[in-house]
Structures are given as C-alpha cells and as structure tokens.
Amino acid sequence: MHYYCISFTHKNTDIATREKLSFSNEDKKRELLKLIHTNNKILESLVLSTCNRVEIFLFVGDVESINEHILKTLSLLCGVDRENLSTKADFYEDSGAIHHLFSVASSLDSLVIGETQIAGQLKDAYKFALQEQRCGVHLTRAVHYAFKCAANVRNQTEISKNPISVASVAVAKAKELVNLENKTAVVVGAGEMSELACKHLLNAKAKVLILNRDIQNAQKLCEDLGENASYESIANLKEALNQYEIFFSATNAPHAIITNDLLEEKDYSRYFFDIAVPRDIDVKANEKNIVYAVDDLEEVVRKNLTLREHQAQIAYSIVGTMTNEFFQHLSKLATLPLVKQLRLQADEIAKEQLQKAIDKGYLKHSNHEEARKLIRQVMNAFLHHPSVNLKKLSGTMQNDSVINAMRYVFDLKNENMEGLNLYKCEFNLENNHEI
C-alpha cells in the first residue's frame, strides 16, 4: 500500500496547460475521479484544483502503471498531449507524497508563500472526494494530519503574518503602476478571490465596481464591503471596459470573457489583472492595454519570498518533523493491534488446551486457577520480547514487512481498518476551521 501524488503547479507547468487541467467545475472533477478509479490498484483519490495547481493525491495498492493511467486519463479528459504532461508533472511516493501534501497545506508550495486560501481549498477538495466516496480512511488520516501540520506552521512561525494572496499581490502590482486613490477599479466576479481583491483595493483607497452574473451575490458582497463598493450586471461589461482604467477578473468561466472585440480605442492606458485559471482575459497586450496574468506576478512574489525566507525554513523543518510523526503514527496504528491480537490468540489457545486437559483428566478441576496463572505467566514471558521488538519497529522502514510477515505466520487478520468512522478522524476539520 502506498501514498502517491501527481502534481502540476506554477513551478512546473505553464498557465496555458494549467487552464486545460483546471477542475473548478464539479462535474468535470467528478468525471476525473470516476476515470481514475477504473484502475483497480487505485483505492482512494482526491483532486485539488486551484489557479496555481492541480494535485492528484492517491492511496494505491501498487504504484506500477499508476503514472501511465493518470497521464492517459488527464490527456483524454483535458485534451493535452500525454508526453507533454509527462515532462511537466512531478511524482511523489510515500513519504515524498505526504511531505508534499503537508507543504501544500501549509502554503509553502504556493505561488505566494504564506497565503491563507490553500487550506480552505484543500478542505473543499477533501469534502468533495468524501462525498463522492472516493476518499477513505487512508487519505482521511493524511489530510487531517496535513491540517494539523498547517496549524503548527501557522502557530509556530510568522509565515502567515499579514496574510497575502494572489489577489493582494495583483493589487500591490497595480499600486506600483498607478495611483489607486479615488480611482474606480472594476472587479469581475463575486467569489472569494474577487472579494479579496475588493478588500485590498478598498484598503488602497480605491473604489470598486463589481460586475457579476448573479446580482444578488454582488449586492451582498457590496453590503459587506461598505459604501465605496457598487455593483452592476455583467451585461454592462463592455460599457465598463470602455469607461474605466483598472480591471481585475476572477470568475469560474470556462473561457475568456474580456476579449479584444469588446474594447474601443482609447487615448489612455488600461490595466488588466487576470487572477483566474482558466484565464478570463484574452486581450492583446500593448502600450495602451497592459495585461497581467497569474504567472506574470513572479517579481512581486519573489519579494514576498525573500521577506519570508527565514520563516519558510522553520516551516519546512516542521513539515519534515510532522511527516516522520505521521508515519510513526500509522505504524502504531498497525503495531498495537497486532500485539493485542497475538496475546488474545495465545490466551484463547491456552484456555482451549487447559479445558481439554481437565476434560481428559490430566488435570484436576480444583487446580484450574493455579494452572491458568502458570500458563499466563509462561505466555507473557514468551510474548514479552516479540511485543517489545514490535513496538521498537514502529516508524522504521522494516515495520510493514515484519507486521505482514507476523500476520502471515500467525494467521492474524488485519482488523485495524474495520469499523473505522471516516467522519471521526484524529484531527477533525471543524476544529481547524481557522486555518
């Protein structure tokens, strides 16, 4: 049994390919999970899809042919050449997969180190996989331990102090290019990323105009944001594009919604910040139309990374420690029941043989208790060293091999996973809602 991860991120995959691999649509994500499980070696799966990454976390019976199956599935579903995907993807197995999961949850692998959105996105991905019955006890334990790791990183470092996001980085870039004070910035969309962009724009003393298909959502967001926020229907997009100078877009549209044909020629510059994947903006960049997509914000991100580099080193140390702790935790979950089963089996055999001895007259019934105590002492003495050594093996590389051998030799069933409640895990999501 193995943990496994196939990863496409801003580090290894261009935005054009990430657009095609986007699974923000639940129906598309559901179809991907269904196709993933056509390989019977894949026991559990979870798909995390954001503007900067697509991560496929798996628990598999055997890693052989898993890469090929996943790459072919993605190629078929997303229309991307399989060889192209193969050269871009990063593959992680066992401790590498868990270390990567913990790093992602702790925002150490994000475009913006320390951003606070990723944990919520991982929660949503986990809940969806659970709802679709694709995520079982193994990934559940890993994800919940990832939340524990993220909480430790947050509490023991300052990496998320003055939390930032892709939206805040985009606004910071806008502030470098133009004085935002008293300017009206148009924000297309009313989701989480748009809300963050609005808040940062308002903090920069700009005014915001929200354009959205769902007027009620836009109205509610404006009420939360205050008097310097207004809203209109997205039907007014063309008019807004030719009236204002600064635009931020973060919708879940499957195709571009701001295109060249909507733009009239102007004698002033317009600034477009596309913080969506797939991209919302398909405008030809020139001296009058300045366009920034997610991957164009690297310069601001590098400044952020430099400021947080020391805290990131501390955070990676925590992730490494938590990765080791996780596998030790799993080893104990396997080892302790085995020790208990050994003792129970020995006790049952002792009881059975003692009763046979009494029934056949080899032992007087009046001596039953004394004989029982003697047998228990012999049994405890015999099992002492195996029990101690099994506990010592917990967390080591040999642990699984020895446990499997012991189960085979003594014909012990693996009852550790039976009756486990997926909703009652070691680290409950509800207790970590603030991550």
From Swiss-Prot:
Source species, domain of life: Bacteria
Q: Which CDD domains does this chain map to?
A: NAD_bind_Glutamyl_tRNA_reduct
Site entry (Important for activity), positions: H100
Q: Which InterPro entries match?
A: 4pyrrol_synth_GluRdtase (IPR000343), 4pyrrol_synth_GluRdtase_dimer (IPR015896), 4pyrrol_synth_GluRdtase_N (IPR015895), GluRdtase_CS (IPR018214), GluRdtase_dimer_dom_sf (IPR036453), GluRdtase_N_sf (IPR036343), NAD(P)-bd_dom_sf (IPR036291), Shikm_DH/Glu-tRNA_Rdtase (IPR006151)
Keywords for this protein: NADP, Oxidoreductase, Porphyrin biosynthesis
Under HAMAP family, the record lists: Glu_tRNA_reductase
Other facts noted in the record for this chain: During catalysis, the active site Cys acts as a nucleophile attacking the alpha-carbonyl group of tRNA-bound glutamate with the formation of a thioester intermediate between enzyme and glutamate, and the concomitant release of tRNA(Glu). The thioester intermediate is finally reduced by direct hydride transfer from NADPH, to form the product GSA.
Family from the record: Belongs to the glutamyl-tRNA reductase family.
Q: How does it assemble?
A: Homodimer.
Q: What does this protein do?
A: Catalyzes the NADPH-dependent reduction of glutamyl-tRNA(Glu) to glutamate 1-semialdehyde (GSA).
Q: What name goes with this protein?
A: Glutamyl-tRNA reductase
The species this protein belongs to is Campylobacter lari (strain RM2100 / D67 / ATCC BAA-1060)
